Curated annotation (Swiss-Prot):
Its main location: nucleus. The modification N-acetylalanine is found at A2. This is Activating signal cointegrator 1. Interacts with the thyroid hormone receptor/TR (via the ligand-binding domain); this interaction requires the presence of thyroid hormone. Interacts with the androgen receptor/AR; in an androgen, testosterone and dihydrotestosterone-dependent manner. Interacts with ESR1 (estrogen ligand-bound); competes with UFSP2. Interacts with UFSP2; competes with ligand-bound ESR1. Interacts with DDRGK1 and UFL1; the interaction with DDRGK1 is direct. Interacts with NCOA1. Interacts with EP300. Part of the ASC-1 complex, that contains TRIP4, ASCC1, ASCC2 and ASCC3. It comes from Mus musculus (Mouse).
Amino acid sequence: MAVAGAAYREPLVHWCTQQLQKTFALDVSEEIIQYVLSIENAEEIREYVTDLLQGNEGKKGQFIEDLITKWQKNDQEFISDSFQQCLRKDEILDGQRSVDQLKRSRRKGRNKQEVPAFPEPDVAVEVKTPLDLAKAQESNNSVKKKTRFVNLYTREGQDKLAVLLPGRHPCDCLGQKHKLINNCLVCGRIVCEQEGSGPCLFCGSLVCTNEEQDILQRDSNKSQKLLKKLMSGAETSGKVDVSTKDLLPHQESRMKSGLEKAIKHKEKLLEFDRTSIRRTQVIDDESDYFASDSNQWLSKVEREMLQKREEELRELRHASRLSKKVTIDFAGRKILEDENPLAEYHSRLDETIQAIASGTLNQSLVTLDRSCEEPLGVLVNPNMYQASPQWVDNTGSTPQKKTSLSAGPRLEPSLHQHQLRIQDQEFQEGFDGGWCLSMHQPWASLLVRGIKRVEGRSWYTPHRGRLWIAATGKRPSPQEVSELQATYRLLRGKDVEFPNDYPSGCLLGCVDLIDCLSQKQFQEQFPDISQESDSSFVFICKNPQEMVVKFPIKGNPKIWKLDSKIHQGAKKGLMKQNKAV
């Protein structure tokens, strides 16, 4: 029955296909139209076709009404024809019954009248040539062909349901319904076959397939023609203008209100970033007093301090009533009890927790331990736990110095400060921790050669002493080298000997970092060389040493530590160079 109904709807299917292609330029497969015509409700057909045409105005509405009229007429004809076919079948069955009765009567000899049998509907075709054989096979295949059902959840079914409009139209299928063209490299939009190759419908940059990209990279006449063809609609596509779309009034108002909220939120975030006010607070339950034993981040001193304070507070909270404070007022004849006996308990608890959370507990302990010692004076590092150096006089007045040192804390301030002064510059110069700084060429070679005396950075470093210099992997251009050499000829003089080559990606040598100054301090203390750097912080470098053999190395940002084996080899290379010099 389904096959007969599909065959009966073929003229209507053909009419729908032609109307959609000619009037609306829609390439819709026959399976979709047959599915629409198989719907039994006229309202469902009207709703489906309206969604397919994206509206029911003008010609679209007229087409929908014509389609429903033809569909109803077609169904009525189909019902009447099927009814007539049923009647014919009943007549045929009655005729067959009469023939059977005649045969039975003829067997009995009562009625000798012969009734002709029904002629065979199909006559065998005589096959004489290969063409006749092919025609016979086609007729057999057409008779045996059955209706094939396609699963809509497979790839084939999805392809048949997808509608591809002619031209480039915005589509939000994300490459699920249509074939994927590519992703926009600027905004990241997923462009499908419906949007097509060309300017991105959001940002306007070119989006094309991999095959088209290969053609464009050839830089030939064909690639220029293809580029011109793809970018032909760049003026009209570009960014999608919301005002050009057909929006309903409530959609337009909702979009405007959303835009206003987004602008207000942007201004709020910019204001927060401008003021940099702390508006959030992290509450860590592990740093609470009651979790002191389980907090793994506390040091041993902090844990002991908390346990001691916990015992004190427990005794204070569960103290005997005999130790309760009572005030007797003889003049007023009153006895006053302590109104809030746990006030001291809560105050001590809060002080301890706040000291641990802020990290000032260790500092308070250090200050308590230091309070009983002698004043520190002008030590470079006041937290150094070692005896202060003593002055050794080689002129023969050592006993007098010793007696003055044994005089106790009643010494003169100048003598006491002189005693506590630490001269650590030689120690820092002699100590090599293997710290390295990565620099671009040709500045790295000029610093190791001693032509460049300072190095500018946007960050401060507390490092002092030997600093290794490594060249990055970027090779300098001849123009950069010539410009930098001309600059340093003006600053240092014409007799400067520049290096012959500027190797990259290797360890060049080392310098001694004397100080790190701000730009203002640098201009005040070194006005002669203030033109060499205008950075926020300036490294003052002295004693440059270049390696004979440059080790290949990969740099890191800021100041980083060398590998121990490379560090030992670099120090040996410097020693060999010093001996050779």
